[in-house]
Amino acid sequence: MTITRKSHPLMKTINHAFIDLPTPINISGWWNFGSLIGLCLIIQIATGLFLAMHYTADTLTAFSSVTHICRDVNYGWLIRNMHANGASLFFVCLYLHIGRGIYYGSYLYKETWNVGILLLFMVMATAFMGYVLPWGQMSFWGATVITNLLSAIPYIGPDLVEWIWGGFSVDKATLTRFFAFHFILPFIIAALAMVHLLFLHETGSNNPLGISSNCDKIPFHPYYTFKDLLGVVILLGLYMTFVLFFPDLLGDPDNYSPANPLNTPPHIKPEWYFLFAYAILRSIPNKLGGVIALVMSILVLALFPILHTSNQRSLTFRPISQCLFWILVTDLLILTWIGGQPVEPPFVIIGQVASILYFLIILVLFPLAGLIENKMLKW
């Protein structure tokens, strides 16, 4: 008997997931981002592995080892720039993927959605720890400020911070453990992504109309493999443009100075993809309140399936909800801008208004709009 993709145990699994998978006929380019996130993860793991071969996780030599990679290692500058900008690309794809899920009601696949939220938290943790590794000024102070937020947790907070630091400040122990976690987490993310796919293939993909597509499906290959391939070519084009022409555009100039615990940078801020959450954190003058708001800014995604009140799944035929969705997108862009600004008027009040609006749209206005649209359509 010949071994075919339909009979071989391993090939059979791959076949069901990527070749003969029944896929809705009408899914648009917004469905490309899942595969693009997978590509980003592969690029990050590959470039990260080569960086880890030359990097030393020691406070005295970490900064020098990154310089050594860029100057002395064959194509080290390219690998380092690919890894640094790959993180930005990863988050662009993630946010667009989540936005697609919200717009088209994909969050109603609860298991897939919840695993996705867990994946987002893990990717954010990995990116944060990776930012600490070059041991520049912003690496050190970013690590100090963000880990210090845990001290706001009642009773166990201060002990928890010292436990994470491995001492009384961010030092060698912190850097070593951050490197260890930064190395292992992407592999856990890859495994969890498989679980994400497993749950998705239990239900099948959603589509722009938000209705069942069981009556009209096509095989994933060759139709969507080639469609995804177009996305890959566009993505790699944008990616390599950034890597080769503007490698430092998204970075912070402060991170080109070695970490100095005696000199605080004037504006401590995380990478651009965390600025919206950082703005929400800073909008609340209370430390514990800020930390809760920071966590809730991501965790609020888990409430989408519970707060879905409309009789339609997608926003395709829901004009009020569409307006709210694009206001939410604009609000997130404003929060991202505010997160990069100093804490002074008028930025403080703009950030506070934008933070309130963010939670108001998700928790109140979206469910309300769903009910109004049901009435308008007499459903």
From Swiss-Prot:
The lineage of its organism: Eukaryota, Metazoa, Chordata, Craniata, Vertebrata. The keyword Transmembrane applies. Heme b b566 binds at residues 97, 196. It is found in: Mitochondrion inner membrane. It is a multi-pass membrane protein. It comes from Liomys adspersus. Pfam families: Cytochrom_B_C, Cytochrome_B. Heme 1 (or BL or b562) is low-potential and absorbs at about 562 nm, and heme 2 (or BH or b566) is high-potential and absorbs at about 566 nm. Keywords: Electron transport, Heme, Iron, Membrane, Metal-binding, Mitochondrion, Mitochondrion inner membrane, Respiratory chain, Transmembrane, Transmembrane helix, Transport, Ubiquinone. SUPFAM superfamilies: a domain/subunit of cytochrome bc1 complex (Ubiquinol-cytochrome c reductase) (SSF81648), Transmembrane di-heme cytochromes (SSF81342). This is Cytochrome b. The gene is MT-CYB. GO terms for cellular component: mitochondrial inner membrane; respiratory chain complex III. The keyword Ribonucleoprotein does not apply. One of its GO terms (biological process) is mitochondrial electron transport, ubiquinol to cytochrome c. Its cofactor is heme b. GO terms for molecular function: metal ion binding; ubiquinol-cytochrome-c reductase activity. Heme b b562 binds at residues 83, 182. The chain crosses the membrane at residues 33-53, 77-98, 113-133, 178-198, 226-246, 288-308, 320-340, 347-367. Component of the ubiquinol-cytochrome c reductase complex (complex III or cytochrome b-c1 complex) that is part of the mitochondrial respiratory chain. The b-c1 complex mediates electron transfer from ubiquinol to cytochrome c. Contributes to the generation of a proton gradient across the mitochondrial membrane that is then used for ATP synthesis. A ubiquinone binds at residue 201. It comes from the Eukaryota. The cytochrome bc1 complex contains 11 subunits: 3 respiratory subunits (MT-CYB, CYC1 and UQCRFS1), 2 core proteins (UQCRC1 and UQCRC2) and 6 low-molecular weight proteins (UQCRH/QCR6, UQCRB/QCR7, UQCRQ/QCR8, UQCR10/QCR9, UQCR11/QCR10 and a cleavage product of UQCRFS1). This cytochrome bc1 complex then forms a dimer. Gene3D superfamilies: Cytochrome Bc1 Complex, Chain C.
